[in-house]
């Protein structure tokens, strides 16, 4: 697959009947839910779960979400969703990117981006990333893949 960044963390996706909207394609809100699902799965694969967030009283919260819906997808299509961590100041902020590819023709149907900020769960206020976040997340920051 022609990924925007190397070494993606991926999950399969397939629109179900309840995901299809009145325009007869996957509702845009479903893509947002899939992005949340893969974001958590990626974090857990790096050793940080919701339980760890609660124990550390820290979380990476979405400050801004941006989605480019490039092509529609239909009921039962096989898709692959990828995510990467692509930037961080190592203190408060991080960027996560997403790309959704339709398997049958390798077309990119969605690109997304989250700007994240570290917060204290107990206060909701911005707080410095704990060492556990830096160790897990900063070691996997991706750089854009070469494109023709």
Where are the model-predicted features located?
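Hydrophobic beta-strand-centered segment that forms part of the acyl-chain substrate-binding groove
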Residues: 42-94, 109
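Short, electropositive, low-hydrophobicity segments enriched in small/polar residues
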Residues: 26-28, 51, 128
